[in-house]
């Protein structure tokens, strides 16, 4: 089984390093920066450490490899596809691990589907330096099952998400809205807590509200409650914005939350649920989708 990487940055290096430790040999790679005066040194050092052979062009990888990993920045992944699509062949596996949008992954599939190649949209959901090739991957596309079949025996952790290219990337990017968003909220929250000398109290109070409760329960409670009480909570957030500004802090995330609450007012959920209350997040999201 010949494995090749187009792009040899952090993702390709860590995956190839892990696969090498599992016993896979003969991995090849290429990188647009491999001959760069400064960045090329890192590419060559990484390849040497992982026992990977560097080759000159993308096409060399595509013509040689049974599994082609496209591991370039998202802005270049379509260019790579267009560069190698004439070299792709039936039964070959093309795995794109870039953090591209679902639409880009769909466009890649449209560009290559007539070649007979198997395509896997592979979204990495963990720490590459820590997990190496065992980083959790969600994969979709007509080649996702083959990707799982070939690489799980070598320690890769692959979860399937259907045969539609773009589904795996959608999972990754939607998840990022929450994970990156809550991290930004944590920073803003603790800056404000620190400014007013109430850090310990805030941590204890929020912990009491959140600890030990399943995420699904939080989701149902917060989405339905916000829909019903968006106007009052937006007014409260106005005070939070003023407080942050008085402390010389940037209230950007709080302003975004305030605007999000205000945007719900047009649906008038409080009037809809006078006699009964919504209990599931789906009730709110479905109503917004239908009336948007």
Predicted regions span which residues?
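Rossmann-fold dinucleotide-binding core
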Residues: 100-180
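Rossmann-fold NAD(P) dinucleotide-binding segment
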Residues: 59-119
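NAD(P)+-binding Rossmann beta1-loop-alpha1 motif at the extreme N-terminus of oxidoreductases
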Residues: 1-64
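Short, basic/aromatic-enriched C-terminal tail that caps enzymatic domains
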Residues: 274-292
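Helical "substrate-binding/catalytic lid" subdomain
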Residues: 171-277
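Conserved beta-strand segments of alpha/beta enzyme cores
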Residues: 26, 53, 93, 118, ...
């Amino acid at each position: 089984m010949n494995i090749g990487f187009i792009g040899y940055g952090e993702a390709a290096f860590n995956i190839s390093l892990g696969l090498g430790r599992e016993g896979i040999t003969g991995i090849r790679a290429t990188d647009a920066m491999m001959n760069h005066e400064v960045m090329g040194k890192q590419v060559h050092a990484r390849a040497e450490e992982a026992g990977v052979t560097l080759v000159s062009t993308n096409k060399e990888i595509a013509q040689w490899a049974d599994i082609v990993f496209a591991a370039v920045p998202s802005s270049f992944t379509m260019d790579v596809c267009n560069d190698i699509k004439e070299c792709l062949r039936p039964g070959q596996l093309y795995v794109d691990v870039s953090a591209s949008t679902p639409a880009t992954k769909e466009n890649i599939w449209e560009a290559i589907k007539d070649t007979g190649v198997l395509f896997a949209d592979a979204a990495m959901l963990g720490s590459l330096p820590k997990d190496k090739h065992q980083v959790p991957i969600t994969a979709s596309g007509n080649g996702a099952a083959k990707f799982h079949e070939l690489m799980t025996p070598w320690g890769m952790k692959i979860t399937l998400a259907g045969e539609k290219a773009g589904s795996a990337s959608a999972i990754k990017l939607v998840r990022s809205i929450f994970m990156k968003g809550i991290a930004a909220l944590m920073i803003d929250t603790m800056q404000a807590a620190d400014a007013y000398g109430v850090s310990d109290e805030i941590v204890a109070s929020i912990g009491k509200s959140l600890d030990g409760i399943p995420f699904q329960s939080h989701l149902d409670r917060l989405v339905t409650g916000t829909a019903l009480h968006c106007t009052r909570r937006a007014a409260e957030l106005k005070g939070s914005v003023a407080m942050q500004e008085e402390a010389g802090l940037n209230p950007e995330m709080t302003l975004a939350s305030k605007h999000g609450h205000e945007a719900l007012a047009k649906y008038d959920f409080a009037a809809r649920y006078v006699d009964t209350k919504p209990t599931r997040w789906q009730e709110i999201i479905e109503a917004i989708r239908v009336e948007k």
